[in-house]
Amino acid sequence: MERSLKKTKNNYNNSIKSNLMKDDELFHVIHKVPCGDTPYVRAKHAQLIEKNPEMAIVWFWKAINTGDRVDSALKDMAVVMKQLDRSEEAIEAIKSFRPRCSKNSQDSLDNVLIDLYKKCGRMEEQVELLKRKLRQIYQGEAFNGKPTKTARSHGKKFQVTVQQEISRLLGNLGWAYMQQAKYLSAEAVYRKAQMVEPDANKSCNLAMCLIKQGRFEEGRLVLDDVLEYRVLGADDCRTRQRAEELLSELESSLPRMRDAEMEDVLGNILDDDFVLGLEEMTSTSFKSKRLPIFEQISSFRNTLVC
């Protein structure tokens, strides 16, 4: 009888422990916090549970210095720093500590850097990084010769194709040129991006390039494609609202005819390096040893600047 009671008690205790373990696992799954008590785990707990970004950065630094999941710690710390308007510090951290990170993490760090450069208005560095990433894709380096790669957003994994990545990078490059008032370069990039994977947001940006150059009718045609649902993403409310605002801006600008001086403004000066690379890559014929998937995108090589 006593043995039976002891066995029942042990089973009860084991059941409680099992339930506690399940609850603990469920907690980490729900809050997307890793298990354990390492510096990186403490950093994620401070970031996601305690909502204390300053403390999270302290623990991220400890994780980096002790070699605890350095890839994730550096990237996550940079994201938190950006949220705290410490983007310049985040840029220097990535540049200083990325040599400690694995080769597979470099692409993710580049993407964080692109956002940080944009946040800080460091357009020249953003443009150079975007061009380098586009060259890597064309040369077959970025995807390890595969047609897709796995990306992560908000804790969820998804597949990204070569074409989607090219379109995304070209979109970012076009926007960077826009901030530099290099509207012809931006136009060329957006047109190539639309050839790879058309979407309504890039159509709006292309229309803005044309409006800035006084090419109102061309801009109207591009906006019509959005407002008539002829491009992907045209049903998005914010995109449609932006297209309508651009159309209003266009119509208000129509009475002001473009004069000869407009040809000399900074916005109509094409990036010389961009043109040179465009012409050289268009005129150059060569045989490639790359995988077929990269041969399929060879028609887009003139988006890259040598």
UniProtKB/Swiss-Prot annotation:
Set out the biological process GO terms recorded for this chain's protein: cellular response to sulfur starvation; regulation of glucosinolate biosynthetic process; regulation of sulfur utilization
Q: Which residues form a coiled coil?
A: 72-139, 238-260
**Protein's UniProt name:** Protein SULFUR DEFICIENCY-INDUCED 1
UniProt keyword terms in alphabetical order: Coiled coil, Nucleus, Repeat, TPR repeat
- Per the entry, what induces it? Induced in response to sulfur deprivation.
- TPR repeats at which positions? 1-22, 71-104, 107-140, 167-200, 202-233, 270-304
**Which Gene Ontology cellular-component terms appear in the entry?**
nucleus; transcription repressor complex
Q: Which family does it belong to?
A: Belongs to the MS5 protein family.
Gene for this protein?
SDI1
Family matches, as Pfam families: TPR_8
Subcellular localization is given as:
Nucleus
The signal peptide annotation in the UniProt record is none
User: Mind telling me which SUPFAM superfamilies this protein's record contains?
Assistant: TPR-like
Q: What happens when the gene is disrupted?
A: Maintain higher tissue sulfate concentrations under sulfur-limiting conditions.
